[in-house]
Amino acid sequence: MTSPTVSDAASAPIRTVPIAAIATAPGRGGIGVVRVSGPDVRAVMQAVCGRLLPPRQATYLPFLDADGAAIDRGIALWFPAPHSYTGEDVLELQGHGGPVVMQLLLSRCLRAGHGIGLRVAEPGEFTRRAFLNDKLDLAQAEAVADLIEASTEAAARSAARSLDGVFSQTVHALVERVIHLRMLVEATLDFPEEEIDFLEAADARGQLADIRARLDGVLAQARQGALLREGLHVVLAGQPNVGKSSLLNALAGAELAIVTPIAGTTRDKVQQTIQIEGIPLNIVDTAGLRDTEDEVERIGIERTWAAIARADVVLHLLDAADYRAHGLSAEDAAIDARIAEHVPPGVPTLRVINKIDLAGAAVPGRVDAQPPEVWLSARDGSGIELLRAALLEIAGWQGGGEGLYLARERHLSALRSAREHLTIAADHADQRAQSLDLFAEELRLAQEALNSITGAFSSDDLLGVIFSRFCIGK
């Protein structure tokens, strides 16, 4: 994406009403920020700061109320359009981060800007304006929210790369190749009488194969980026007292769940997000599965089945001594069957044989069974690394987060759609005499799918959904 210049008429910001919001998180903090963006913001600056400020310089001064008394003292920053986050005139007021002070400062800005139509910003509206004014493309705008919400260091670094435009540049490179191939097809359609065969001369089939191969690489990397963003939802299930809470504590490296030898100690689900190699894992410890007359425990068991229905992977825990001596019990076989009924299609189950430290000669290990098994001891940690490795394998993590960009399911869907259209295009290329128009159309649809990632082609409905999930001050 080419940065706009002052002389470029196309870089002029879209005319909108001015907006304001507290840009920092709710609560108390050392610093709080009120952001104002839009036309005629100088009027707010003059009223609140008492004077006009030099562009892009930090100025320490009092923030004034309508009577000229100081609300707070802090730093004011003035960014004239188009050289600002939104591409509009932007005023940022950095004061002390108390909620009362911030609300007073925001209210003062709104009153000072009443005559110019200043209003409170909607969620994500600052970033939406940055997108509409070509300061960010859509993938970069989404990366702003992903960076804020990142739950691991790897996710944060990948989001930062997306914000820098790494993902967008990769998609743009694919689009350029598709456009070039489309030009060859259109030339062949428009000039059929020419002696030169544009497609044969340019090796159109070879170009298409190259585009598909590059797209496969982007899709594989995007899947890894999506895993960094979304993580894995892991549910611990099994009969009471098989060590589910102990396993949660072992994976988390902290005493998060109460552990006692009394069956039914856990009556409601306990959730904790941990990370393995930068992948966030949302681990859910659940109530033991059994028939019970206890109303509270029964509700907990119902929530267990609800959690299983939303899982990305289910760990069915069994007692190693019982399993080694007698195999799968009727109760555990019934649990296996019910898990299969509740999990979404394609969601794997991993059998975790726990308490090997109490099972004689049992040793930690992985068994290639159906479902796969991991033998471990949550109490002394034996085999925990094997379980971590199994979870990464199930997730499809290939390691090496360096260079990855964060991706969303929306991006994966667009990439898969583009690949499908390119596959159909390849079929038409093999039957070019009858299908040249269809070849061109599939290339157009592939380009459209890729453009939807960066927002070069996006519906208003899609934009509304994306930006509504931002925090107010972004």
UniProtKB/Swiss-Prot annotation:
One Gene Ontology MF term: GTP binding
EC number(s) per entry: 3.6.-.-
Record: residues binding K(+): N241, T260, I262, T265
Cofactor note: Binds 1 potassium ion per subunit.
Compartments it resides in: Cytoplasm
Keyword Cell membrane: no
Cofactor(s) demanded: K(+)
Protein's UniProt keywords contain Hydrolase: yes
Residue numbers binding Mg(2+): S245, T266
InterPro entries: G_TrmE, GTP-bd, GTP-bd_TrmE_N, GTPase_MnmE, MnmE_dom2, MnmE_helical, P-loop_NTPase, Small_GTP-bd
Function per UniProt: Exhibits a very high intrinsic GTPase hydrolysis rate. Involved in the addition of a carboxymethylaminomethyl (cmnm) group at the wobble position (U34) of certain tRNAs, forming tRNA-cmnm(5)s(2)U34.
Protein name: tRNA modification GTPase MnmE
Source species: Ralstonia nicotianae (strain ATCC BAA-1114 / GMI1000) (Ralstonia solanacearum)
